[in-house]
Amino acid sequence: MNPAVVLFLALITSIILIILFTATIAIYHDFVTIEQNYNMTAYAQQQNTQANNVLVTGFRFLFIGLIGVTIALIIYQRRT
């Protein structure tokens, strides 16, 4: 299989993963917000902080991967 096709598929997969990750965190934040509105417990605050940490870390890794795949695709296109 052509390496450019593989890299392009990796790029599309990265974008899809970012969309799915964002949707998952948004749904999780909605549940945490509902819990906070009814009862602002220490557990809800902890879950909110944890969700924010997961969000930041996840996006960091996803965007680093996306940038890496994009750079690899550009380098491959210039060599051919």
Curated annotation (Swiss-Prot):
Signal peptide: none annotated. The lineage of its organism: Viruses, Viruses incertae sedis, Bicaudaviridae, Bicaudavirus. This is Putative transmembrane protein ORF80. Keywords: Host membrane, Membrane, Transmembrane, Transmembrane helix. It is found in: Host membrane. The keyword Lyase does not apply. Disulfide bonds: none annotated. GO terms for cellular component: host cell membrane; membrane. The keyword Transferase does not apply. The chain crosses the membrane at residues 5-25, 55-75. It is a multi-pass membrane protein. It comes from Acidianus two-tailed virus.
